[in-house]
């Protein structure tokens, strides 16, 4: 199994157990599912029907997005201007990371061109996205984007391909 970590923070972002689709050569998208966590009730007595029913047990159950829950991502917020400011700094950091890894100029130029194009897509649909940081909540790390498919039901995440490094487990 491969786990993809943020190259800037080391936070685990996603794994290959999700069907990652490369989009425009610059991001991965992965469909998610909604899961229910919490709300479990365990009867420990011999006669469960005679025990008092605990009220409110169902209230503690929450619906979460599996990727967000599994990788302990934290919701954050942005306005359009704030996101653009963040994205500019993040792209520079990823570009520097590519240089440190020894990427050639053509690869870096390709990344810049494709990232700029995809950023325009994000901004044009900005109001549709939810934003998540990695577990460390480091503001310089990757912001994972959550949106819903055209059916309005299926959530999916978008992560920057060049901002990830593989870790085999």
Curated annotation (Swiss-Prot):
SUPFAM superfamilies: Mss4-like. The keyword DNA-binding does not apply. InterPro entries: Mss4-like_sf, Mss4/transl-control_tumour, TCTP, Translation_control_tumour_CS, Translational_control_tumour_p. Pfam families: TCTP. GO terms for biological process: cytoplasmic translation; negative regulation of microtubule depolymerization. Residues 1-169 form the TCTP domain. GO terms for molecular function: calcium ion binding. Gene3D superfamilies: Metal Binding Protein, Guanine Nucleotide Exchange Factor, Chain A. Keywords: Allergen, Cytoplasm, Cytoskeleton, Microtubule, Protein biosynthesis. It is found in: Cytoplasm, Cytoskeleton. It comes from the Eukaryota. One of its GO terms (cellular component) is microtubule. Signal peptide: none annotated. The keyword Oxidoreductase does not apply. Involved in protein synthesis. Involved in microtubule stabilization. PANTHER family: TRANSLATIONALLY CONTROLLED TUMOR PROTEIN-RELATED (PTHR11991), TRANSLATIONALLY-CONTROLLED TUMOR PROTEIN (PTHR11991:SF0). Belongs to the TCTP family. This is Translationally-controlled tumor protein homolog. It comes from Alternaria alternata (Alternaria rot fungus).
């Amino acid at each position: 199994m491969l786990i993809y970590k943020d190259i800037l923070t080391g936070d685990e972002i996603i794994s290959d157990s999700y069907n990652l689709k490369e989009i425009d050569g610059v991001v991965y998208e992965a469909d998610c599912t909604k899961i229910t966590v919490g709300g479990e009730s365990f009867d420990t007595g011999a006669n469960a029907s005679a025990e008092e029913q605990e009220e409110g047990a169902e209230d503690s159950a929450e619906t979460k997005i599996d990727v967000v829950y599994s990788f302990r991502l934290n919701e954050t917020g942005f306005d359009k201007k704030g996101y653009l400011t963040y994205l500019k700094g993040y792209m520079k950091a990823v570009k520097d990371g590519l240089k440190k890894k020894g990427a050639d100029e053509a690869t870096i130029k390709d990344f810049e061109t494709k990232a700029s194009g995809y950023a325009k897509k994000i901004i044009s649909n900005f109001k549709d996205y939810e934003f998540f940081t990695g577990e460390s909540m480091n503001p310089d790390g990757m912001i994972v984007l959550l949106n819903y498919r055209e059916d309005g039901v299926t959530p999916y995440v978008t992560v920057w391909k060049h901002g990830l490094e593989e870790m085999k487990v």
